[in-house]
């Protein structure tokens, strides 16, 4: 497989706020969404190689055959469908008696200038990136509360900290996911449940293919041609750029967060994510000026 993850848990030095170094002793059960490729697939392998019982899910179960061969349990799961979510969670509870960790990884990026993105596309973006994790979280929380233990890991993005022209819809969905996670952390802490945000920068996956598909379906107004030219450049999006992380880098952070007795609340992954976090503290006029210069240079 091209995205094999490291077979051992390494000390995490990538987090903005690191958790306790102590690892949980017993192998546990994890439910991971969006495992057809990239981060999700690599994360499922990393958990399995560390003796977790892994339920790897995707919209099309046929995309999970290699994970099944590796020892993962697989299931078809559409994060936008309540019945699909309940069916998978009920199966895990019946087979394992509980869910120790939920990794909300499924997602995609709807790029494009705000004016050009139809409302129905915005709704679809939020249905997958925000309402999907919300559905899964609501489904697993009663069981985690009963066990007085559990970890919910939401895979966000540096775009959940910093928005940019052409990325407002995607960033909006990730900003929302971060807000939900912040609130949830305070709500469930008393029940022994941890809520963690993992915030990758660009990652070498097929994520860019979906970006191009979504942008290709937009009306593409001439008024924003410079933004489209930037988005047409694969390296400008970042998926194959020199600062992109590998899926195994993200998988390692997710596994470490799930294995910690006291994980940190946030883990940026990769140089772009770390600098993106710092960019939030740059005065808005200065940040806008830099974006304007970048548009002129790259557009």
Language-model-derived ranges and their functions:
Residues 36-37:
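Conserved glycine-rich cofactor-binding loop
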Residues 189-241:
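C-terminal beta-strand-loop-alpha-helix "lid" module of Rossmann-like NAD(P)-dependent dehydrogenases
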Residues 113-114, 121-123:
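Substrate-binding pocket helix/loop in short-chain dehydrogenase/reductase
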Residues 137, 173-176:
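Active-site helix of classical SDR
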Residues 73-76, 83-97:
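Conserved amphipathic alpha-helix within the SDR
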Residues 157:
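Residue(s) in the substrate-gating loop at a strand-loop-helix junction
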Residues 91-104, 110:
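A glycine-rich helix->loop->beta "capping" turn
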